[in-house]
Amino acid sequence: MKNARTTLIAAAIAGTLVTTSPAGIANADDAGLDPNAAAGPDAVGFDPNLPPAPDAAPVDTPPAPEDAGFDPNLPPPLAPDFLSPPAEEAPPVPVAYSVNWDAIAQCESGGNWSINTGNGYYGGLRFTAGTWRANGGSGSAANASREEQIRVAENVLRSQGIRAWPVCGRRG
């Protein structure tokens, strides 16, 4: 009785208490079987001549998940509606010139960037044709934009300095 109580307690703790028919209950009564007798052809049991059984996966283990194509440890990417809208185009950055070219043009030509007086000097900063071409200008300075004339004037300033405008350069 003590063994039955211990077995019932252990089964209840393990959660494996199962009802069975009385025929399946083992007892100590002699059933006419000799456990030490040689096994007959109908006996089922261990055969030392057979190779070991392959390891089988446990029955309760779910199949391994297929490769999902992403790292499950990382958060999912943001949905397209949560992405920030494209940035608006910033206004162009104003160009910082090394001198005040408008002040020099005001002194040289009265601020007229397309002046051609016929004296061999052209545009608001009064370029000669040779100086204009040598410093990256194309066509005539009188037909060039203010920005183009200033670009060429910056090249002249780097090669000749402000003395290229001997009277009006000091105003820049």
From Swiss-Prot:
Q: Tell me the keywords, alphabetical order.
A: Hydrolase, Signal, Virulence
The organism's place on the tree of life at top rank:
Bacteria
Gene name of the encoded protein: rpfE
Gene3D superfamilies (UniProt xref): 1.10.530.10
Q: What cystine linkages occur within this chain?
A: none
For this protein's source organism, the top of the classification is:
Bacteria, Bacillati, Actinomycetota, Actinomycetes, Mycobacteriales
Q: Please report which protein family the annotation says this sequence is part of.
A: Belongs to the transglycosylase family. Rpf subfamily.
- Region (Disordered) residue ranges read 33-89
From the Swiss-Prot or TrEMBL record, give the protein name.
Resuscitation-promoting factor RpfE
Entry keyword Hydrolase: yes
What is said about its interaction partners and assembly? Interacts with RipA.
Q: Which organism is it from?
A: Mycobacterium tuberculosis (strain ATCC 25618 / H37Rv)
Q: Which GO terms describe its cellular component?
A: extracellular region
CDD domains per record? RPF (cd13925)
Described function: Factor that stimulates resuscitation of dormant cells. Has peptidoglycan (PG) hydrolytic activity. Active in the pM concentration range. Has little to no effect on actively-growing cells. PG fragments could either directly activate the resuscitation pathway of dormant bacteria or serve as a substrate for endogenous Rpf, resulting in low molecular weight products with resuscitation activity.
The annotated consequence of gene deletion is: Not essential, disruption of rpfE alone has no effect on growth or survival in liquid culture, nor in mouse infection models, although colony size is reduced. Alterations in gene expression are seen. All 5 genes in this family can be deleted without affecting growth in culture, however quadruple deletion mutants (rpfA-rpfC-rpfB-rpfE or rpfA-rpfC-rpfD-rpfE) are not able to resuscitate spontaneously in the presence or absence of O(2), and are attenuated in a mouse infection model.
User: Which factors induce or repress this protein, as stated in its UniProt record?
Assistant: Expressed in actively growing cells.
- UniProt cross-references to Pfam families, sorted A to Z: Transglycosylas (PF06737)
Output the Gene Ontology terms for molecular function.
Answer: hydrolase activity
The broad enzyme category this protein falls into is: hydrolase
Q: Which GO terms describe its biological process?
A: negative regulation of gene expression; positive regulation of gene expression; quorum sensing; regulation of cell population proliferation
